[in-house]
């Protein structure tokens, strides 16, 4: 099923992402640490008539460029889920949506209560995020004994969490806005929307408008370019060039023609058969909506290339000269750690109990309290999105390092605690629960 395929891809990506984080930490604390940090500060851009355009550091290009592809896939997933997935029927998703919302609010409140009024207050958005790749990777390690309802709950929660993180970035981590550039970006978005309504299915067309128009305009506007990627993703057509009944009729006809075109038993195909296969391949491609075609083709790139590169560029922390007193000089690390490790589980558990007690939503029979708390701890793994938001929240390198330390501590502890609780709760289950 689509959800199971999504989970399988995410858990594999989580493993690769974990390896990349370890490599980044090793490099940052090795004899090559200076080379490691300086490498990502190299400037890249375009020069025209002696002037530099889009001239940013490699680190900036990774966070605003490559990560836009990650957010584009997030946008595709969100649109698919709203149309026909876990978020299509709100009645079936009240529980994980409520858990996601409370799981974002409580961590933010915990952080803000410890950092209100100071220079570090802007980091309140850091502990709000869940890393879907890592959380699902741990569910994968637990094996097939994990009830599907728990996988659906955590996946839906993480999807809503992603949407919340995107909104937080757009509304609270954007400054120095150029409304002229935004207007240009909106014009290109409108062009993509109109093309969608007119039935244009060519993904190259949308790619040119999305990158050459929307993304560059938003990059120059002051709004984080990753938001442009999400908006552009929502403009991608979700209906196929040919409908399912038409595809089935054509495929059946072509299969019959294929059978009739071979007069003997030789291993090679007749020329007519090759042409029939070409037509079937073309029809099969046209039967897949552009949205799903892009999502399917980009997922491996994002999971196994873009996310590991992001981790290599952002996860490296040098522990040289870092003391406990220095880390605790302010409440950044503590706020992030407590927000993720305490706020996430508390928000998720309290909202679930509240919604079920009020009979607003119904929890699955397989969702025991121990498993719910375990899922809450898995949701406290914030690696990717939390690190990304931390780079937007803090310019001061000291605050940034402290935030990353809090993220690492909470994510590791949350992952271990979540694994142990779920493992103990599943100890008597020997076969998959569907």
Residue ranges and their predicted role:
Residues 17-28, 72-76, 106-108, 188-193, ...:
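Hydrophobic core segments of alpha-helical transmembrane domains in multi-pass membrane transport
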Residues 27-39, 53-56, 73-88, 107-125:
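Transmembrane alpha-helix boundary signature
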Residues 50-51, 55, 60-84, 303-322, ...:
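Hydrophobic transmembrane alpha-helices of secondary-active transporters
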Residues 81-108, 178-187, 321-343, 407-411:
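Entry/N-cap segments of selected transmembrane alpha helices
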Residues 139-246, 252:
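Functional cores that coordinate and move charged inorganic groups
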Residues 250, 262-358:
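Transmembrane helical segments that form the transport core of multi-pass membrane transport proteins
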Residues 427-434:
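Conserved small/polar residues in nucleotide/adenosyl-binding loops
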């Amino acid at each position: 099923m689509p959800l199971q395929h999504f989970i399988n891809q995410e858990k594999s990506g989580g493993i690769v992402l974990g390896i990349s984080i370890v490599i980044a930490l090793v490099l940052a604390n090795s004899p090559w640490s200076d080379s490691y940090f300086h490498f990502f500060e190299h400037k890249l851009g375009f020069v025209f008539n002696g002037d530099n355009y889009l001239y940013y550091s490699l680190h900036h290009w990774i966070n605003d460029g490559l990560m836009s592809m990650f957010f584009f896939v997030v946008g595709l997933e969100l649109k698919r889920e709203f149309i026909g997935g876990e978020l299509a029927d709100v009645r079936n998703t009240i529980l994980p949506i409520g858990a996601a919302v409370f799981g974002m609010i409580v961590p933010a409140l915990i952080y803000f209560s410890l950092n209100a009024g100071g220079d570090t207050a802007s980091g309140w958005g850091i502990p709000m995020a869940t890393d879907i790749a890592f959380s699902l990777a741990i569910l994968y390690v637990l094996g097939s004994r994990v009830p599907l309802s728990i996988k659906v709950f955590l996946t839906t929660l993480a999807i809503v969490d992603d949407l919340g993180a995107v909104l937080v970035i757009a509304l609270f981590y954007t400054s120095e806005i150029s409304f002229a550039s935004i207007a240009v970006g909106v014009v290109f978005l409108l062009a993509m929307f109109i093309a969608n309504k007119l039935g244009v299915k060519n993904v190259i067309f949308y790619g040119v408008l999305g990158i050459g128009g929307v993304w560059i305009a938003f990059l120059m506007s002051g709004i984080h370019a990753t938001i442009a990627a999400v908006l552009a993703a929502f403009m991608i057509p979700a209906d196929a060039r040919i409908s399912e009944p038409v595809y089935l009729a054509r495929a059946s006809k072509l299969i019959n023609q294929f059978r009739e075109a071979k007069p003997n038993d030789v291993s090679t195909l007749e020329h007519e058969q090759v042409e029939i296969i070409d037509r079937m391949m073309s029809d099969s491609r046209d039967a897949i909506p552009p949205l799903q075609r892009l999502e399917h083709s980009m997922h491996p790139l994002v999971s196994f290339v873009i996310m590991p590169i992001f981790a290599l560029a952002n996860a490296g922390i040098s522990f040289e000269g870092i003391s406990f007193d220095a880390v605790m000089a302010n409440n950044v690390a503590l706020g992030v750690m407590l927000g993720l490790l305490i706020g996430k589980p508390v928000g998720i558990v309290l909202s679930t109990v509240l919604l079920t007690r009020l009979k607003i939503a119904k929890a699955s029979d397989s969702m025991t309290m121990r498993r719910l708390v375990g899922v809450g701890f898995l949701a406290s793994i914030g690696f990717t999105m939390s690190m990304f938001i931390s780079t937007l929240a803090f310019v001061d390198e000291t605050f940034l390092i402290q935030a990353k330390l809090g993220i690492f501590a909470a994510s590791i502890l949350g992952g271990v605690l979540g694994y142990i609780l779920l493992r103990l709760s599943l100890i008597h289950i020997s076969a998959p629960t569907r």
